[in-house]
């Protein structure tokens, strides 16, 4: 069969390419300037071929990293770094349930059910075997930086050369979402039974109660809150963690979506009934769960309740849009122009953070709002493992999708209320912040996670 003119031309090009081909040993030596030079890569899991800048390939080989990047002016979030590492990140970190002693020693719970230890023995979640916690058991580094118009959030297991590396030690927080108050010891405990979480106590009381467990125990600590949200952003490669849950993986084998809007029902304090930890016992799952239980009124009247759409992030249940949590180490100063500035400490230590004064604290940043009302920020300052609004222009369905409330006050100190309650809807989430309340305030809709 005769070839067409176009086919003959293509064959000639193939022959020409073959004749001009060189063995590796015949190639010219490359210059030491690697700018613009690429190497070819092949992903054995997806079968895809791709290219990478040589400088990035060398960086990955020396210190593998993964993460996301996004432009503050655009809603899309992109994956960067090692796809393989991001796919395996929950396993590499060993995310899941733990029983943690006051000295921070820990035993991993079974990823299939938190009623068993990973070794197969029965696990008591009532506090007798340790605090029922969720967390990770491998330290890592976090990098947050701007480059070519993008904000990057990345993690690695060794320091990345040329970047500021935040060291994240082994950590954990209340796996059921919230801690309970032990009146006998006046301390916070994490349990996994369907009990009433601590509520209607000020952060000053909660802070002291958490620290009674020993060194480096906190209530609603800012770094733990930040890291939880950051891990969700990376694993879902999505800034808005309240995006609908999607059990399907992408073609690259990555998770997508988020952990959902949050609990479908407000906790029943509005009718005088005690709130209840909505326990989900199905291990280190990534899903949206449900819960049925019974609670009581102050007069002893019982009420059956049912919650659905409960986030379960590898064993961390109901961690937002259920009960508000005021941070024990974030402090707001209300400025004369009506804006609010966030103050933190450079490091997290063994001493109590003073919530009654700015003395000794460090200015983190100032929010771009000076009028009263709920806002949806487009961007945040995320230095020092804390977040604070840096740019207006978001919405409930774009960018981070979380709310910030400025009371418009022109003087005074305020606490930072995190995460949102069951009635907050779209405002709630990992970078939700309400700056309306004083540090001595207490509400029935406020609680604490122990970390």
List each model region and its residues.
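Short hydrophobic/aromatic-rich beta-strand motifs
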Residues: 28-43, 315-317
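Short, surface-exposed terminal/edge motifs of secreted or surface/virion proteins that either
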Residues: 40-60
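Short aromatic-cysteine micro-motif
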Residues: 124-131, 155-319, 448
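Acidic glycine-/aspartate-rich tracts in secreted/extracellular proteins
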Residues: 43-47, 140-142, 177-178, 224, ...
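Short acidic-hydrophobic catalytic motif
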Residues: 62-194, 292-296, 312-313, 421-422, ...
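C-terminal, surface-exposed recognition/capping segments
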Residues: 66, 226, 248-281, 323-331, ...
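Short, intrinsically disordered N-terminal pre-domain segments
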Residues: 1-30, 449
